[in-house]
Protein backbone atom coordinates (compact mmCIF):
# COMPACT_ATOMS: atom_id res chain seq x y z
CA UNK A 1 0.00 0.00 0.00
CA UNK A 2 1.46 3.39 -0.99
CA UNK A 3 2.18 5.85 1.78
CA UNK A 4 -0.33 8.59 2.43
CA UNK A 5 0.59 11.88 0.73
CA UNK A 6 2.45 14.34 2.91
CA UNK A 7 0.23 17.22 3.96
CA UNK A 8 1.17 20.89 4.13
CA UNK A 9 1.26 20.53 7.92
CA UNK A 10 3.71 17.61 7.67
CA UNK A 11 5.97 19.58 5.34
CA UNK A 12 5.74 22.50 7.78
CA UNK A 13 7.08 20.22 10.50
CA UNK A 14 9.85 18.84 8.32
CA UNK A 15 11.17 22.25 7.28
CA UNK A 16 12.52 23.29 10.72
CA UNK A 17 14.25 19.91 11.03
CA UNK A 18 15.75 20.33 7.57
CA UNK A 19 16.90 23.84 8.49
CA UNK A 20 18.65 22.59 11.62
CA UNK A 21 20.23 19.71 9.68
CA UNK A 22 21.48 22.16 7.05
CA UNK A 23 23.23 24.24 9.71
CA UNK A 24 24.96 21.30 11.40
CA UNK A 25 28.16 21.49 9.29
CA UNK A 26 28.39 25.22 10.02
CA UNK A 27 27.88 24.61 13.75
CA UNK A 28 30.47 21.82 13.65
CA UNK A 29 33.10 24.25 12.37
CA UNK A 30 32.54 26.46 15.40
CA UNK A 31 32.73 23.47 17.72
CA UNK A 32 35.96 22.27 16.09
CA UNK A 33 37.39 25.79 16.24
CA UNK A 34 36.60 26.09 19.93
CA UNK A 35 38.23 22.72 20.60
CA UNK A 36 41.32 23.19 18.43
CA UNK A 37 40.07 20.62 15.94
CA UNK A 38 40.38 22.44 12.62
CA UNK A 39 43.56 20.51 11.70
CA UNK A 40 47.02 22.00 11.31
CA UNK A 41 45.76 24.24 8.49
CA UNK A 42 42.35 25.69 9.48
CA UNK A 43 42.09 27.82 6.31
CA UNK A 44 42.52 24.81 4.03
CA UNK A 45 40.16 22.73 6.16
CA UNK A 46 37.36 25.31 6.06
CA UNK A 47 37.85 25.97 2.35
CA UNK A 48 37.62 22.28 1.49
CA UNK A 49 34.80 21.56 3.92
CA UNK A 50 32.64 24.43 2.64
CA UNK A 51 33.21 23.22 -0.92
CA UNK A 52 32.25 19.66 -0.01
CA UNK A 53 29.05 20.75 1.72
CA UNK A 54 28.15 22.95 -1.23
CA UNK A 55 28.30 19.88 -3.44
CA UNK A 56 26.39 17.71 -0.97
CA UNK A 57 23.55 20.24 -0.67
CA UNK A 58 23.48 20.65 -4.44
CA UNK A 59 23.13 16.89 -4.95
CA UNK A 60 20.39 16.72 -2.31
CA UNK A 61 18.57 19.51 -4.17
CA UNK A 62 18.82 17.57 -7.43
CA UNK A 63 17.60 14.41 -5.67
CA UNK A 64 14.30 15.98 -4.59
CA UNK A 65 12.53 15.54 -7.94
CA UNK A 66 13.43 11.84 -8.41
CA UNK A 67 12.61 11.18 -4.76
CA UNK A 68 9.17 12.80 -4.91
CA UNK A 69 8.26 10.89 -8.05
CA UNK A 70 9.59 7.55 -6.91
CA UNK A 71 7.83 7.85 -3.54
CA UNK A 72 4.63 9.41 -4.87
CA UNK A 73 5.12 12.40 -2.55
CA UNK A 74 4.78 15.54 -4.72
CA UNK A 75 4.81 17.76 -1.61
CA UNK A 76 8.54 17.06 -1.21
CA UNK A 77 9.12 19.70 -3.88
CA UNK A 78 8.44 22.29 -1.16
CA UNK A 79 11.74 21.32 0.44
CA UNK A 80 13.79 21.88 -2.71
CA UNK A 81 14.18 25.64 -2.34
CA UNK A 82 15.64 25.34 1.17
CA UNK A 83 18.11 22.70 0.02
CA UNK A 84 19.13 24.90 -2.89
CA UNK A 85 19.61 27.91 -0.64
CA UNK A 86 21.82 25.87 1.67
CA UNK A 87 23.91 24.92 -1.36
CA UNK A 88 24.26 28.64 -2.11
CA UNK A 89 25.03 29.40 1.56
CA UNK A 90 27.93 26.97 1.68
CA UNK A 91 28.97 27.98 -1.83
CA UNK A 92 29.12 31.60 -0.66
CA UNK A 93 31.34 30.61 2.26
CA UNK A 94 33.56 28.65 -0.12
CA UNK A 95 33.74 31.65 -2.44
CA UNK A 96 34.46 33.98 0.49
CA UNK A 97 37.29 31.72 1.64
CA UNK A 98 38.89 32.04 -1.79
CA UNK A 99 38.32 35.80 -2.04
CA UNK A 100 39.49 36.60 1.48
CA UNK A 101 42.06 34.02 2.49
CA UNK A 102 43.46 32.93 -0.87
CA UNK A 103 43.32 36.19 -2.85
CA UNK A 104 43.48 38.68 0.03
CA UNK A 105 40.46 40.66 -1.25
CA UNK A 106 42.55 41.78 -4.24
CA UNK A 107 40.31 42.17 -7.35
CA UNK A 108 43.25 42.06 -9.77
CA UNK A 109 44.56 38.84 -8.21
CA UNK A 110 41.07 37.36 -8.35
CA UNK A 111 40.64 38.14 -12.05
CA UNK A 112 44.06 36.70 -12.83
CA UNK A 113 43.19 33.53 -10.92
CA UNK A 114 39.89 33.15 -12.78
CA UNK A 115 41.62 33.64 -16.12
CA UNK A 116 44.67 31.46 -15.53
CA UNK A 117 43.49 28.48 -13.45
CA UNK A 118 40.81 26.32 -15.14
CA UNK A 119 39.46 24.82 -11.92
CA UNK A 120 38.96 28.34 -10.54
CA UNK A 121 37.32 29.41 -13.81
CA UNK A 122 34.66 26.69 -13.67
CA UNK A 123 34.17 27.15 -9.93
CA UNK A 124 33.62 30.86 -10.41
CA UNK A 125 31.14 30.19 -13.23
CA UNK A 126 29.23 27.76 -11.02
CA UNK A 127 29.02 30.31 -8.21
CA UNK A 128 27.76 33.07 -10.53
CA UNK A 129 25.00 30.75 -11.77
CA UNK A 130 24.15 29.73 -8.20
CA UNK A 131 23.86 33.39 -7.23
CA UNK A 132 21.44 33.98 -10.11
CA UNK A 133 19.26 31.05 -9.03
CA UNK A 134 19.31 32.11 -5.37
CA UNK A 135 18.35 35.68 -6.31
CA UNK A 136 15.38 34.41 -8.34
CA UNK A 137 14.21 31.71 -5.93
CA UNK A 138 11.32 33.78 -4.55
CA UNK A 139 7.65 33.59 -5.51
CA UNK A 140 7.89 37.19 -6.74
CA UNK A 141 10.70 36.28 -9.15
CA UNK A 142 8.77 33.24 -10.32
CA UNK A 143 5.74 35.38 -11.18
CA UNK A 144 7.86 38.11 -12.74
CA UNK A 145 9.87 35.79 -14.98
CA UNK A 146 7.00 33.51 -15.94
CA UNK A 147 8.09 30.68 -18.26
CA UNK A 148 11.62 32.06 -18.30
CA UNK A 149 11.95 31.15 -14.61
CA UNK A 150 11.89 27.42 -15.32
CA UNK A 151 14.36 27.84 -18.18
CA UNK A 152 16.72 29.79 -15.93
CA UNK A 153 16.51 27.29 -13.10
CA UNK A 154 17.45 24.43 -15.39
CA UNK A 155 20.93 25.93 -15.01
CA UNK A 156 21.15 23.86 -11.83
CA UNK A 157 22.22 20.94 -14.05
CA UNK A 158 25.08 23.02 -15.48
CA UNK A 159 26.01 24.07 -11.94
CA UNK A 160 26.24 20.43 -10.92
CA UNK A 161 28.52 19.58 -13.84
CA UNK A 162 30.72 22.63 -13.26
CA UNK A 163 30.98 21.86 -9.55
CA UNK A 164 32.11 18.29 -10.24
CA UNK A 165 34.62 19.52 -12.82
CA UNK A 166 35.92 22.11 -10.34
CA UNK A 167 36.33 19.40 -7.71
CA UNK A 168 37.89 16.96 -10.20
CA UNK A 169 40.53 19.39 -11.45
CA UNK A 170 41.41 20.43 -7.91
CA UNK A 171 41.89 16.84 -6.77
CA UNK A 172 43.58 15.71 -10.00
CA UNK A 173 46.56 17.90 -9.17
CA UNK A 174 47.02 15.79 -6.04
CA UNK A 175 46.18 12.49 -7.75
CA UNK A 176 43.25 12.00 -5.37
CA UNK A 177 40.10 11.32 -7.40
CA UNK A 178 38.15 9.08 -5.02
CA UNK A 179 35.72 11.77 -3.82
CA UNK A 180 35.21 13.42 -7.23
CA UNK A 181 34.40 9.99 -8.68
CA UNK A 182 31.90 9.33 -5.88
CA UNK A 183 30.09 12.67 -6.20
CA UNK A 184 30.34 12.54 -9.99
CA UNK A 185 28.68 9.10 -9.98
CA UNK A 186 25.81 10.41 -7.84
CA UNK A 187 25.34 13.35 -10.21
CA UNK A 188 25.45 11.04 -13.24
CA UNK A 189 22.77 8.85 -11.63
CA UNK A 190 20.52 11.84 -10.92
CA UNK A 191 20.94 13.31 -14.39
CA UNK A 192 20.54 9.87 -15.97
CA UNK A 193 17.22 9.44 -14.19
CA UNK A 194 16.03 12.75 -15.62
CA UNK A 195 17.09 11.81 -19.14
CA UNK A 196 15.29 8.46 -18.83
CA UNK A 197 12.14 10.17 -17.51
CA UNK A 198 12.24 12.68 -20.37
CA UNK A 199 12.67 9.86 -22.91
CA UNK A 200 9.67 7.98 -21.50
CA UNK A 201 7.49 11.10 -21.66
CA UNK A 202 8.64 11.73 -25.22
CA UNK A 203 7.78 8.17 -26.21
CA UNK A 204 4.37 8.37 -24.54
CA UNK A 205 3.55 11.58 -26.43
CA UNK A 206 4.06 9.95 -29.83
UniProtKB/Swiss-Prot annotation:
It comes from the Bacteria. One of its GO terms (cellular component) is plasma membrane. It is found in: Cell inner membrane. InterPro entries: Fe3_Rdtase_TM_dom, MsrQ-like. Keywords: Cell inner membrane, Cell membrane, Electron transport, Flavoprotein, FMN, Heme, Iron, Membrane, Metal-binding, Transmembrane, Transmembrane helix, Transport. Binds 1 FMN per subunit. It is a multi-pass membrane protein. Pfam families: Ferric_reduct. The chain crosses the membrane at residues 14-34, 45-65, 82-102, 118-138, 149-169, 179-199. Its cofactor is FMN; heme b. GO terms for molecular function: electron transfer activity; FMN binding; heme binding; metal ion binding; oxidoreductase activity, acting on diphenols and related substances as donors. GO terms for biological process: protein repair. Part of the MsrPQ system that repairs oxidized periplasmic proteins containing methionine sulfoxide residues (Met-O), using respiratory chain electrons. Thus protects these proteins from oxidative-stress damage caused by reactive species of oxygen and chlorine generated by the host defense mechanisms. MsrPQ is essential for the maintenance of envelope integrity under bleach stress, rescuing a wide series of structurally unrelated periplasmic proteins from methionine oxidation. Belongs to the MsrQ family. Heterodimer of a catalytic subunit (MsrP) and a heme-binding subunit (MsrQ). This is Protein-methionine-sulfoxide reductase heme-binding subunit MsrQ. It comes from Bordetella pertussis (strain Tohama I / ATCC BAA-589 / NCTC 13251).
Amino acid sequence: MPAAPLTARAIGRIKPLLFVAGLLPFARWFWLGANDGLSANPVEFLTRSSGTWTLVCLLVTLAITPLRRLTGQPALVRLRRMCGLFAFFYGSLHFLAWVWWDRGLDPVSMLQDVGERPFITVGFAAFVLMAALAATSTQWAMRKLGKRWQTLHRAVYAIGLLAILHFWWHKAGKNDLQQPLLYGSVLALLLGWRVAAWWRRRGAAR
